[in-house]
Amino acid sequence: MKLLFIGDIVGSPGRKALAELLPGLQAQHGLDVVVANGENSAGGNGITPDTAAEIYAAGVDVITCGDHLWDQKEVEILLDEEPRFVRPVNYPAGTPGQGSTVIERAGQPTVGVINAQGNTFMRGELDNPFRSVKEESVSYTHLRAHETVRN
């Protein structure tokens, strides 16, 4: 299985580069899953449903975010309606959205994506990212935990 993780997609130039380059990378490398950080895709300040749509259209399967999540009010739509949009799992209980998602495709291993935000030099009250990821991963142990993927 081939996975690609992309760091910050920043503004219009980042979205344009993604749209131009990702299809070729997918074809050249046979990528199975693409995860990208989109929290700065709206002019370097947050993400909107429109910028998320561009990122998904370019071939990204899951969008993660971090401390710039709340920079655009429209993000609430993504948190409420888009299962492929993953906020940090270690945000306080009751925060809208989800901290993880699962990608299931016929003939491929199931892939779980958990997003956590570090808490060093960060504002706000974040739970311990290591503890949060460990707790979240327990809910996924039933997903082909007995299989080992080698590629």
Q: At which residue positions do the language-model features occur?
A:
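Core catalytic region of metal-dependent phosphoesterases/phosphodiesterases
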Residues: 6, 16-97
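Divalent metal-coordination and catalytic microenvironments
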Residues: 8, 63, 114, 150
